[in-house]
Each structure stands twice: as C-alpha cells, then as structure tokens.
Regions:
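Conserved glycine-rich cofactor-binding loop
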Residues: 13, 20-21
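C-terminal substrate-recognition "lid" of short-chain dehydrogenase/reductases
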Residues: 124, 139, 219-248, 253
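Conserved glycine-rich Rossmann-like NAD(P)H-binding loop of the short-chain dehydrogenase/reductase
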Residues: 36-50
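Alpha-helical segment proximal to the catalytic Tyr-Lys
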Residues: 132, 176-180, 239
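Substrate-binding pocket helix/loop in short-chain dehydrogenase/reductase
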Residues: 103-104, 108-116, 142, 207, ...
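Active-site helix of classical SDR
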Residues: 127, 163, 171
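Residue(s) in the substrate-gating loop at a strand-loop-helix junction
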Residues: 147
C-alpha cells in the first residue's frame, strides 16, 4: 500500500459524536476531507445541520443525527439509525463531552451522573452497538477523546477528570476485546484548545496564558493540530497500534 493510501479514508464511514462544534466538528471535517462519509451526532440540531452543510459545501459527504447521549434510549436509536445514510460505520469517534465546573462539595448527583453518562457511558455503549458490524467486516476503528485531565487533576473539574480517566482505561479494554477482530481502539488526549467546553479558561486571558506557558511549545492548541492524529488513528496507517492514548498537548503532560 502506498504511503498516501495509508492515510486515505475513501470508502470509509465515520460516526462522530459531539460534532456540532469544537473537537468533534473539526475531526468530522478532517475525515470528510480525507474521503470518508461522515455521520455527525450531537444534541444541538441547528448547529449540527450547519456543520453538515459546511462539509457538503466543500464537496464532502455528511449526514446528521440529533441525539442526547445522556439518554440511553436516544443513544441506542442513534446506533440503529447510523447505517441508514452511508452503511455501517467503520470508524467511531467519541468526542461528545461536558464539564460541569463546580467545587467538589457543591456537585449534585445529577452533575455527576450526567457527566459520566455523556463522557464515559456513551463511549462504551455506542461502540458496543456498532462493533458487531465492524467485526463482520474484519476492520474498524474506535477513536475516543480522552483529556489531559485523564492523568492530571484540575480544580472544579472532578467529574470530568474522573470520566476522562475512565475513557483512557476503557480504550484499553476495547482494544483487548476487539483488536483480534481487526478493530483498533485508541484515544486522543488533547491539552488546552479553544472550544465551547474550555470557554471559561479561554475567556480568562491570565489563565489561558498560564496554560500555554506550561507547554513545551509555548502555546495552546489549535483545532488543526488534532487533524493529523485523528486521521492517523482512523486509517490503515495505525493498523498495528491499539490500546494507546496519544497526548496532543504541546508537551504539557510531559513536563
């Protein structure tokens, strides 16, 4: 296989959650540009349709499913509907996430439960529903979005950090279970990127600069910085890589 074809996603179908904005939208657009047909999943329908239209306007193939991943019935319905557009997904990207920023003593049961349902549970149940079709093909990719907080604690982010630590270990478990069937499961752990999820930090210049200063590169991430890693983990280029978490954080986690 030529080097260019190693990274070519033509003929593949990717399902991406959290695709109405931020990291999910950036990954969906990158996959479409690399040749994949993309099924974009999110809760906010208007933003989701706009994201789909952008990909289609650029010549890509995209469709969307409105889904509240915190609701199990909605998640299962999404898995049922996904193959209707372009066929069964070959690639699943779990990029949806929330971060309820409260001091630990102020967190409610609902804060905890909703964070875990969206950030961790969905990353288990959605691939579980879609993996049988990948197993039948003998090829598939799961790309989970972990976090710098998978391995580091930050204030007022307790449930988020716990959920992302779980995502990192879930990735290993998925790899152990399914790699023998041709499904490679890996995770991307982003550092600080300007997204709706990080708005409280982005909107505080002092905090934003402080985070940048902790990287080796000297800046926080731009969404384009994730495209290469996301395509790599979804393509034949990563055929012998599974159960790994790649930190895309400018060296923050290595410091």
């Amino acid at each position: 296989m030529s080097v260019l074809k190693l990274f070519d996603l033509s003929g593949k179908v990717a399902l991406v959650t959290g695709a109405s904005s931020g990291i999910g939208q950036a990954i969906a657009a990158a996959y479409a540009e690399a040749g994949a047909a993309v099924v974009m999943v999110a809760r906010r329908e208007a933003e989701l349709k706009t994201a789909v239209q952008k990909i289609q306007a650029a010549g890509g193939k995209a469709a969307c499913i409105r889904c509240d991943l915190a609701e199990r019935k909605s998640l299962y319905a999404c898995a049922e509907q996904a193959p209707e557009f372009f066929g069964a997904p070959d690639i699943v990207v779990n990029a949806a996430g929330i971060n309820i920023r409260k001091p630990m003593l102020e967190l409610t049961e609902e804060d905890w439960d909703r964070t875990l349902r969206i950030n961790l549970d969905a990353s288990f149940f959605l691939p579980q529903r879609l993996a049988p079709a990948m197993i039948a093909k003998g090829w598939g990719r799961i790309v989970n979005i972990a976090s710098l907080q998978s391995v580091r604690a930050f204030g007022n982010s307790g449930p988020y950090g716990a959920s992302k630590g779980g995502v990192m270990q879930l990735t290993r478990a998925q790899a152990e279970a399914w790699s023998k069937h041709g499904i490679c499961a890996n995770a991307i752990a982003p550092g600080f990127f300007a997204t709706p999820l990080t708005a409280p930090v982005v909107n505080d210049p002092a905090r934003w600069q402080a985070m940048a200063a902790k990287t080796f590169i000297g800046r926080n991430g731009a969404l384009d910085d994730l495209r290469g890693t996301a395509i790599f983990l979804a393509s034949h280029a990563s055929d012998y890589i599974t159960g790994q978490t790649i930190f895309v954080d400018g060296g923050f986690s290595a410091g």
